[in-house]
Amino acid sequence: MAAMDLRVAAPASVAAAARCGTSLARPWPARAVGGGGGGGGRGRRLSVRTSVATTEAAAAAVGASEDAALEARDSKTVVAVILGGGAGTRLFPLTKRRAKPAVPIGGAYRLIDVPMSNCINSGINKVYILTQFNSASLNRHLSRAYNFSNGVAFGDGFVEVLAATQTPGSEGKRWFQGTADAVRQFDWLFDDAKAKDIDDVLILSGDHLYRMDYMDFVQSHRQRGADISICCLPIDDSRASDFGLMKIDDTGRVIAFSEKPKGDDLKAMQVDTTVLGLPQDEAKEKPYIASMGVYIFKKEILLNLLRWRFPTANDFGSEIIPASAKEINVKAYLFNDYWEDIGTIKSFFEANLSLAEQPPRFSFYDANKPMYTSRRNLPPSMINNSKITDSIISHGCFLDSCRIEHSVVGIRSRIGSNVHLKDTVMLGADFYETDLERGELLAEGKVPIGIGENTKIQNCIIDKNARIGKNVTISNSEGVQEADRTSEGFYIRSGITIVLKNSIIADGLVI
């Protein structure tokens, strides 16, 4: 189910009638007031005047309601700020040479494509992206995918990538200390001429997987007169203690926060989620609401909090918003659909494999709300004599007499004969090696990009440009949970083997 719309709209018949200048009231009978003669005539004239007045009032009310609704959905007065500056230590080694938002997902996309596509599909075309760590590949992808000439058209909007910088003075010699500090260091942007018409600032994360119409969120925020709105998920008992939870009153106003509570503290955070629009039966199963880390601030409120009220606070979720809830109007907004924080190797692995399930919990395939990425002009994949079940094969791949089960295979992947992949996420390659180059490598006893023949791989993430030789076995049969084998080209996190980018796994190796 999509995010709840808390509006109460006028029925279509009311709106249509008002626009046509027609009364919806049942016409008075000819003799409804008085009998014949003068009394009846006076009665009918009164009825007509009343009907006209009622129609005009209804038309004015509906017109005002429609104007307010249109104003609430005006995306030109919204700017999105996507936070992509975290070090991504929990996603290491995938973040060894790239920023978190640049991590590939779904075979052909990068994590940054999710909030960017949601912005485009929501009509929000003013976007700032704040980066700090390993931002080269992220910047390259954004320039290819979302520039004005060759990528997605942004009309009168803009996409600006802003890297953390140091400036003269003691205050200017530090990096981003958190989400709020990152925005504070660039708060001068909101005084710029480009921001003069901005009313609300949408704060997004660059490492979440979900599909959302942000303007539904913005509209709810504006119509309820919120200073800050927090997007939240309904959660059941089994998962509640893994999240930061919020407590709301019967109007949806946030009145308390608790970070990963347990026991009695957890029970104290139960709320009536029907207040936010959840059906009664589902509300009983999910009596908690968890913050998604997606926020809307009134621009002036945001600047006041960052500059004057909390000038040293570093984080929105744990510092500024909880401290502000008692002073200003902070509202919760329910998003009751698929959402995943891709913050760890395990969550990254499981989210990718869930794309290959039937039916998938999330799909990149949606004709009405597509996910965008950079144009690569790759040919269709060539698959020869292979068996593929419950898997995603991206474009530009070469598969020869192999077996692939419940896996995601990224762009430009090469998989040799008699290879068996199961529960594997293969990120693909950045470039092709020609047949001549591959032949020369093999003749010299070296390993070309891709997976060599007779190799068996299970429960594994294979980063880009990896060279895996013949007769290799990767299964972590000993059940090792954590291991760092940089010199051998792999790591193990949460029992999942990660073959490093550009690494070489020699023929016959068993992992």
Swiss-Prot record:
It is found in: Plastid, Chloroplast; Plastid, Amyloplast. This is Glucose-1-phosphate adenylyltransferase large subunit 1, chloroplastic/amyloplastic. Activated by 3'phosphoglycerate, inhibited by orthophosphate. Allosteric regulation. Its main location: plastid. It comes from Oryza sativa subsp. japonica (Rice). GO terms for molecular function: ATP binding; glucose-1-phosphate adenylyltransferase activity. GO terms for cellular component: amyloplast; chloroplast. Keywords: Allosteric enzyme, Amyloplast, ATP-binding, Chloroplast, Nucleotide-binding, Nucleotidyltransferase, Plastid, Starch biosynthesis, Transferase, Transit peptide. Transmembrane segments: none annotated. Involved in synthesis of starch. Catalyzes the synthesis of ADP-glucose, a molecule that serves as an activated glycosyl donor for alpha-1,4-glucan synthesis. Essential for starch synthesis in leaf chloroplasts and endosperm amyloplasts. GO terms for biological process: glycogen biosynthetic process; starch biosynthetic process. Belongs to the bacterial/plant glucose-1-phosphate adenylyltransferase family. Expressed in leaves and stems. Gene3D superfamilies: Hexapeptide repeat proteins, Spore Coat Polysaccharide Biosynthesis Protein SpsA, Chain A. Its EC number is 2.7.7.27. It catalyses: alpha-D-glucose 1-phosphate + ATP + H(+) = ADP-alpha-D-glucose + diphosphate. Heterotetramer composed of two small and two large subunits. The gene is AGPL1. Residues 1-58 form a transit peptide. InterPro entries: ADP-Glc_PPase, ADP_Glu_pyroP_CS, NTP_transferase_dom, Nucleotide-diphossugar_trans, Trimer_LpxA-like_sf. It comes from the Eukaryota. NCBIfam families: glgC, PRK02862.1. Pathway: Glycan biosynthesis; starch biosynthesis.
